[in-house]
């Protein structure tokens, strides 16, 4: 099994390190043809407008949508969730539009208002998961086929729709590998 981490911008290294701790072969994906070399893909946190601009400049956006629509398992964190969303509230931004959610960018505030909390994620075990929110998006609406796996303050923060796992916080910034392990089970 080989897992790609989209390497255009953001928390690439942190996701690669988490995967290496789990003994997984990784590939930092920087070219469209590399999307065919991976069994699953992580879209890291970063800056979503920069990420979509780079994807378009590299002609990778359409290939990525095609691979996701054909079943490529994807794990998106923070800005990666914005990239995948079908709808963005009160903001005009290009996106991939493959996940049936509406998101609100930077909904928890600016960088200085970033915070940590614990969330319950029954799908990965009974112990609370340390969630780090940094300029995080808020999922304000989910489609009927979107499964909510975790919430914070009544808002979904971890959702799954088919082959897509989307997390508004940063699990890669913790030592807790349960969400990465959960994603690997989706890939198998």
Curated annotation (Swiss-Prot):
Positions that bind L-glutamine: 46-48, 105, 134-135
Residues forming the catalytic site: 78 (nucleophile), 170 (charge relay system), 172 (charge relay system)
Catalysed transformations (reactions): aldehydo-D-ribose 5-phosphate + D-glyceraldehyde 3-phosphate + L-glutamine = pyridoxal 5'-phosphate + L-glutamate + phosphate + 3 H2O + H(+); L-glutamine + H2O = L-glutamate + NH4(+)
Record PROSITE patterns: PDXT_SNO_1, PDXT_SNO_2
Assembly and oligomerization: In the presence of PdxS, forms a dodecamer of heterodimers. Only shows activity in the heterodimer.
Family: Belongs to the glutaminase PdxT/SNO family.
Name of this chain's protein: Pyridoxal 5'-phosphate synthase subunit PdxT
Source taxonomy: Bacteria, Thermotogati, Thermotogota, Thermotogae, Thermotogales
């Amino acid at each position: 099994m080989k897992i790609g981490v989209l390497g255009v911008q953001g928390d690439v290294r942190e996701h690669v390190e988490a995967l290496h701790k789990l003994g997984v072969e990784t590939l930092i994906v920087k070219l469209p043809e590399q999307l065919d070399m991976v069994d699953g893909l992580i879209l890291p946190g970063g800056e979503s407008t920069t990420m979509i601009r780079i994807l378009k400049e590299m002609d990778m956006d359409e290939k990525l949508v095609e691979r996701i629509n054909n079943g490529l398992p994807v794990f998106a964190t923070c800005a990666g969730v914005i990239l995948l969303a079908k709808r963005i509230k009160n903001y005009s931004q290009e996106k991939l539009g493959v996940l049936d959610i509406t998101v609100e960018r930077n909904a928890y505030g600016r960088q200085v208002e970033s915070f940590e909390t614990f969330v319950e994620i029954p799908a990965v075990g009974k112990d609370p998961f340390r969630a780090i929110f940094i300029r995080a998006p808020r999922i304000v609406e989910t489609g009927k086929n979107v499964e909510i796996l975790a919430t914070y303050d009544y808002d979904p923060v971890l959702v799954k729709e088919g082959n897509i796992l989307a997390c508004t916080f940063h699990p890669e910034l913790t030592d807790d590998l349960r969400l990465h392990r959960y994603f690997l089970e989706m890939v198998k």
